[in-house]
Amino acid sequence: MKKLINDVQDVLDEQLAGLAKAHPSLILHQDPVYVTRADAPVAGKVALLSGSGSGHEPMHCGYIGQGMLSGACPGEIFTSPTPDKIFECAMQIDGGEGVLLIIKNYTGDILNFETATELLHDSGVKVTTVVIDDDVAVKDSLYTAGRRGVANTVLIEKLVGAAAERGDSLDACAELGRKLNNQGHSIGIALGACTVPAAGKPSFTLADNEMEFGVGIHGEPGIDRRPFSSLDQTVDEMFDTLLENGSYHRTLRFWDYQQGSWQEEPQTKQPLQSGDRVIALVNNLGATPLSELYGVYNRLTTRCQQAGLTIERNLIGAYCTSLDMTGFSITLLKVDDETLALWDAPVHTPALNWGK
């Protein structure tokens, strides 16, 4: 294994120290470790908090700043952040209007964020939750019960962050997050595995003519391992799966801060249909050249046009990664005029930065 690290035990500490030094708009907190906006808490605005195991950079710490997250909690590589990190970060960023926890649907994340939610409620913080489960590839896997939360998380953090920035209430921000989760669909493929530094070897092996179709962002298995032939055929198979697996009925939990209890709510993901307008994200899972991602986007635009989908905005690059995995994911999120206005609103974070 050749990686730009000193010691596998220091990877998280050193990368977070570098992030904070590169971006004075962020503050790195210690004991426990978490990252916040330098100006947090911001009075009069809902605070957004997310987190996960490290290895997915720039998610989530790279999305802290004006118009997006107020704070983020990084765990060790592919390991959920502990409840004390989440609790302390939320206490630090709460400006009095409440804290919204954005949680990707992985068993460890759910357990730890739910524990922190109850601790925050007991401490007098107005808090609620949104669970993200956009991966259409599999239901139930190594890390999850139900579908996995992947790159649509980035789009939701941007859009709900813009709503919080303009002064929307905690309930309105949470409702928007749940709506966007039901309108977003993602799928990924891998041509090569990632290497977790502590393991020192690739998490799986593929033959030269194979791909892992529907791979997870921790290297989890997908739908199947199938032959790899060409860019166009790969994008076609992914696009068809996004459309075919769009409809999804399940029950998700959220915290009702008024009742002080967990509530279960049946929800339905909406399949994409001709006439829909979308934000398209072509996401590098770690080691795929940008030139190849643009080739993917070229084919994706053709397939969207054929299906009657209008791409209103796009992102192409590394936004939700899996260390050094060779591969990519596609996310399509249904939008309307209001959603696009939130997307175009100013955002100033290390990884997304536009507007005044």
Question: Predicted segments — roles?
Answer:
Residues 56, 63-96:
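Glycine-rich oxoanion-binding loops at beta->alpha junctions
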Residues 110-124, 143, 292-298:
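Short Gly/Thr/Asp-enriched flexible loops that form oxyanion-binding sites at enzyme active sites
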Residues 259-356:
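C-terminal non-catalytic interaction/assembly regions of soluble proteins
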Residues 132-185:
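Short alpha-helices
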Residues 1-48, 208, 337, 345-356:
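N-terminal amphipathic/basic leader segments beginning at the initiator methionine
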Residues 168-293:
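Mixed-charge interfacial surface used for oligomerization/domain docking
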Residues 72-77, 121-146, 310:
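Short, acidic/small-residue loops that bind anionic groups at enzyme active sites
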Residues 2, 46-53, 69-72, 98-107, ...:
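Short glycine-rich or small-residue beta-strand-to-loop segments that form or flank ligand, phosphate
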